[in-house]
C-alpha cells in the first residue's frame, strides 16, 4: 500500500510533504516547530500550503518546479511567513533562496524567515535571513516530539524508510537523513537487511568521528571501510574502520581492524585478526606462548567486564573461523567455526553463570600458532537483541566504542614494532 506521504515524484518533495502533513494535523507540533526554527512563539491563524503561493490555487508538482516556488509556505494574515526550501541530491543555491525571499516581500510579507533543509551542510555561506537545518536534525527533533505526537512518529518512520530505500537506489549519495538512535530489531520488529544497512552506515559514520577511538586505538577517521555495500538480502551486514597504521594499504586483511556487524539476532562488535594479517603481527601474539596469551586475554576480559557492566545481556565474545573460497567472488565455505564466551577461560571472584572451560581459549591459541588455512580470529562482544535492551538505545554507540577500546591490549601486542 502506498504511504500517505508518498504523493510527489521528487524525493525532497516527499519529505517536505510528510513534514507538512504532520504539522497540519498536529497544531501543537506546528507551534513547537515554529518556536524551534525561529526562536519565537508561533503567531495565530497559521495556514500551510505546498508548491504554491498564498491566495492562489495550489499548483501541480511540475508547474511548481517550472515557476521555482518554495516547497512549502507557512504564513498568517498578519504579514508573517516561514518559507521552506528542501534539497537532498541537488545543492542549495543562494539565488533561488533570494528569489523566494523577494517573492514573499512582493506579496506584502515583512516578517520573513526562510528555512533551508539539506542532507549536508552547504559549502557556501547562506543569506542572513536563512536558517539551515540538516534533514538529520529535523529527524532528531521529530523523534523527541514523538513521545507525545503520533504524527511526529509517523514522519520520523517515513524518513527512516526513505533513507533506506534511497540509499539502496543510489539517490542519497552524501550525508544522511537520520541519526543513529539504536538498533531497533526485536521479536516485534524483526531484522531486515535494507534497514540493517542503513543503521550500520549511521553507526559507523558516528563512530568514525569519535576522538576516543583515534586517541586510544589509532583509528583512521578518513578510512573507507568496505565502501558501497551492494547486497540486497542476507542475515548479516558488516563493515569496519581501519587503523591509521594501515595507511589504507590493500588488501585491508593485512591489518587488524575494528569490525561492526548487524546480524539477524545480535550486534557483533569485534577487533578482527584477519586471515591475511602480516606474519609479524600474528607472531607477536604467538611468541607470547599460551601463558602470555592467557594473561593478555585475561586483561581484555577484565576490560570488557567493565565496558559491558551496564549492558545487561551482552557478553565478551571470541569467534574463530576457517573458510575457503572455491573461486574469486564466490561465497565462503565455512570449514570450521568456534564461538564462545570469553569468560569460559577465566575463573572469577564474582558469581557468574558461565562455567570455566579453558580449552576453548587453548584451541584459539593453537589455531593461531599453527595456522595453515584461511583462518580469522575476532575478539569483542555480542549484544543480542532479545536479551540486551541497550541495543535499542542511542547509548549503544558508546558500548560499541568502549568494546573496541577494551580490546586495546590485543591491538598493542599485535602492532608493536
How would you label these PLM feature ranges?
Residues 1-417:
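Charged, terminal alpha-helix-loop-beta segments
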Amino acid at each position: 500500500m502506498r504511504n500517505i506521504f508518498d504523493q510527489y515524484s521528487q524525493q525532497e518533495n516527499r519529505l517536505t510533504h510528510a513534514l507538512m502533513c504532520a504539522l497540519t494535523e498536529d497544531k501543537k507540533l506546528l507551534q513547537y516547530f515554529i518556536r524551534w526554527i525561529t526562536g519565537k512563539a508561533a503567531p495565530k491563524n497559521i495556514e500551510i500550503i505546498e508548491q504554491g503561493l498564498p491566495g492562489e490555487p495550489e499548483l501541480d508538482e511540475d508547474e511548481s518546479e517550472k515557476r521555482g516556488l518554495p516547497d512549502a509556505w507557512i504564513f498568517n494574515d498578519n504579514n508573517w511567513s516561514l518559507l521552506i526550501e528542501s534539497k537532498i541530491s541537488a545543492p542549495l543555491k543562494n539565488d533561488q533562496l533570494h528569489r523566494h525571499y523577494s517573492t514573499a516581500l512582493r506579496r506584502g510579507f515583512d516578517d520573513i524567515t526562510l528555512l533551508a533543509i539539506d542532507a549536508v551542510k552547504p559549502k557556501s555561506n547562506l543569506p542572513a535571513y536563512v536558517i539551515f537545518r540538516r534533514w538529520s536534525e529535523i529527524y532528531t527533533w521529530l523523534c523527541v516530539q514523538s513521545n507525545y505526537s503520533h504524527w511526529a512518529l509517523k514522519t520520523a518512520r517515513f524518513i527512516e524508510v526513505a533513507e533506506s530505500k534511497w540509499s539502496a537506489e543510489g539517490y542519497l549519495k552524501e550525508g544522511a537523513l537520520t541519526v543513529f538512535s539504536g538498533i531497533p530489531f526485536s521479536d516485534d520488529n524483526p531484522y531486515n537487511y535494507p534497514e540493517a544497512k542503513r543503521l550500520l552506515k549511521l553507526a559507523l559514520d558516528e563512530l568514525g568521528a569519535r576522538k576516543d577511538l583515534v586517541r586510544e586505538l589509532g583509528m583512521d577517521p578518513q578510512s573507507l571501510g568496505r565502501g558501497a555495500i551492494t547486497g540486497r538480502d542476507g542475515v548479516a551486514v558488516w563493515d569496519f574502520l581501519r587503523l591509521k597504521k594501515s595507511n589504507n594499504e590493500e588488501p585491508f586483511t593485512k591489518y587488524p581492524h575494528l569490525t561492526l556487524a548487524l546480524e539477524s539476532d545480535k550486534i557483533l562488535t569485534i577487533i578482527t585478526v584477519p586471515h591475511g594479517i602480516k606474519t609479524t603481527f600474528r607472531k607477536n601474539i604467538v611468541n607470547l606462548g599460551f601463558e602470555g596469551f592467557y594473561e593478555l586475554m585475561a586483561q581484555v576480559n577484565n576490560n570488557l567486564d567493565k565496558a559491558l557492566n551496564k549492558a545487561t545481556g551482552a557478553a565478551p565474545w571470541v569467534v574463530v573461523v576457517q573458510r575457503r573460497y572455491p573461486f574469486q567472488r564466490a561465497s565462503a565455505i565455512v570449514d570450521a567455526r568456534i564461538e564462545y564466551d570469553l569468560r569460559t577461560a577465566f575463573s572469577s571472584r564474582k558469581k557468574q553463570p558461565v562455567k570455566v572451560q579453558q580449552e576453548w581459549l587453548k584451541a584459539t591459541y593453537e589455531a593461531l600458532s599453527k595456522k595453515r588455512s584461511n583462518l580469522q580470529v575476532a575478539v569483542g562482544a555480542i549484544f543480542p537483541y532479545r536479551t540486551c535492551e541497550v541495543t535499542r538505545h542511542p547509548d549503544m554507540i558508546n558500548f560499541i566504542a568502549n568494546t573496541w577500546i577494551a580490546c586495546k591490549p590485543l591491538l598493542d601486542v599485535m602492532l608493536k614494532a
